[in-house]
């Protein structure tokens, strides 16, 4: 993953960036802790390198002397002791994972002979040239092997190679350094050949699997950075969701307000309100669309971060590696001086084969078969190694080349001696371990036995690496299935959310269309009512106009009649007196008739109540008869009453 892709997550500006600052602060603290741990590991490696430097300088001097001198050095130790060597050995004793074997080595090597500091590799070559028949490893090929093996190792291997260094010291302790004589030398050569084969096979295997290591360095996610990035993205997704909800609520409010205003507005105001509403609606729709696109972008980023994670920044990794290689190279200069000078005999041929195999990991893996066939004379088990190396070359050759170019161009040294000190720890350990005992000559039989045993160890290492690779593939497949399940679940959830959002959008569109249709219907009804009212008012005005015209016609007729009557009256002025008398007579007759009618009505009003029932009728008739009787005999009755009421005489 490119650094721009890992840093892009933190380049987005956040308005409320307090949480982001806190995360950045925690990230810097974690990086400082990692740098401290790396520095401590580098110091431990430097201590181990210093101890190995003095150790292998002493063993190199011992391998250059005769067995008689070895016995004399062991029997007659010098009283002077190098304090630096003792301190380094004491520190190695505290750091190494095998203190008992190292204590045996330190007890055997108590009085190292003094060496002149400052003697370069070229001067030593001049002093001790190899025999004519023994091939030596070219310095360039040794550097290429170191670069290839270094490319197969993780970038953090310079800070975590304490077990490798301890294994090298264990090999040195198991080699029987203090055994004098020819037999001890042959035994040391055999053991060192076996251990060198194992170490070289592990180096070749690591270079074969260089793609896995480089990918693990480039692809190992930093948990703290990944966690912070996921939290940051989730916070942004929540903010965008809230903004989308707010925008949708504002759009609904605008629709409700438009409907409310459209109901209580006339035509001109309704058109103006409609224009304003359409502008606001388009703007809110664009805003919601942009927020949804941004939300999908952050969801995609979150999926990528959850799947791939955020690795360490390559700048920091290469800076730490460069510093670590500088320190280790400066401390293990003497350790690397003995690599090229002391590799002789049968081990030199195997080192050349190892170099060819390591170079073939990147370019030509089939050369391994021909080289090992020429060197060892047997090609029974070569296809297994060739297949494993071909797989590493086909899958990850380009990545191994990239790492080789990085590590070859990273350390910058002023001389060839400094450059040789920055090679890989495993190759240097193997070559130096081989250089401890190659000083003495060995027979062809021992060489063939050692080569066959070394080849068996190499095949055993290749088999173990294959098993490890199979386990890694199983773990990778399990992890891949887990991430595929998570990815499918997230995609299903995303599809459901997208489907739900689409349904909501469709419902909202339907509701908006319904409101618009209702508004259009209301407008049509208002227009029809307006037309109806206008028609009714026109009809009423026409009726009123017709009535007024009829009244005017009648008035004009009455005026004409009055005029005609006036004309007639003017013509009948001669008979006016007769007409006046006739009128007065008629008036008198009418008055008499009115009096009679009043009398009759009065009598009727008086008689009618007396005639309503049968009893009243009989009573009324009796009363009338009585009155008539009194009226008829009134004189007699009056005299009788007068006599009755007169006083006596």
Swiss-Prot record:
Record keywords, A-Z: Acetylation, Coiled coil, Endoplasmic reticulum, Membrane, Phosphoprotein, Transmembrane, Transmembrane helix, Transport
GO biological process: endoplasmic reticulum organization; endosomal transport; endosome fission; endosome membrane tubulation; membrane fission
Membrane topology qualifier: Multi-pass membrane protein
GO molecular function: identical protein binding
Pfam families per UniProt: Tmemb_cc2
Region (Disordered): 1-37, 58-83, 110-166, 197-222, 411-433
GO CC annotation terms, alphabetical: cytosol; endoplasmic reticulum membrane; endoplasmic reticulum-endosome membrane contact site; rough endoplasmic reticulum
Coiled coil: 224-310, 457-566
Biased composition (Basic residues): 113-125
Stated role: Endoplasmic reticulum membrane protein that promotes endoplasmic reticulum-associated endosome fission. Localizes to contact sites between the endoplasmic reticulum and endosomes and acts by promoting recruitment of the endoplasmic reticulum to endosome tubules for fission. Endosome membrane fission of early and late endosomes is essential to separate regions destined for lysosomal degradation from carriers to be recycled to the plasma membrane.
Subunit annotation: May form homodimers and heterodimers with TMCC2 or TMCC3 via the coiled-coil domains. Interacts with ribosomal proteins RPL4 and RPS6.
Name the UniProt record assigns to this protein: Transmembrane and coiled-coil domains protein 1
Organism: Mus musculus (Mouse)
Name of the gene encoding the protein in the UniProt record: Tmcc1
